[in-house]
Amino acid sequence: CGVSRSSATAEDLPQASFAGQQETFLNVSGERALIDACRRCFASLFTDRAISYRETQGFDHMEVALSIGVQHMVRSDLAGSGVMFSIDTETGFPDVAVISAAWGLGETVVQGAVDPDKYLIFKPLLEEERYAPIIECTLGAKERKMIYATGGSTRTATVETTQKERELFVLDEAEILELARWAVTIERHYGKPMDMEWAKDGETGK
């Protein structure tokens, strides 16, 4: 199965993020389902929400283009996923990476529908083996998770997490540091602070 992911020209801009304005479809299987998902991605340029946002931000509706990325979908529904920033978005402090993590597919974290775990990492110490660069680990409630749906027309389902899942951190120390190093690498490549999404494959452990 795969994911049909929208990517518009007016996204993640300094003055307007356009976060969540276009649609992404998860757990898509088969050619017909993929074509349908792509059509719906294109059509999401003209939802009430997207039109209203462009009007508010002063963007010409006819000047916004959209492409679609079709990706292999890893089984993060069997593990965890989330988002990370190469800067502290609340304070603007540039020397930390901030990682959010929850069980299941990352859509719950992106949409703000779940209280995720949060990790704060001091970037300058990532290459210093003598020091521990993890500043803080905060356990989130993680009361629900999004998983693959079985049968029917719905591709995903949101279910309650177990008590054990709520009490455990999604990431261990090695995984936190690996993600933080990727955040630094990506930030260096683009030459500016970046926000990223990540997912762990529950079948391969990667």
Model-derived regions, located:
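Conserved mixed alpha/beta core segments that line enzyme active sites in large multi-domain catalysts
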Residues: 1-206
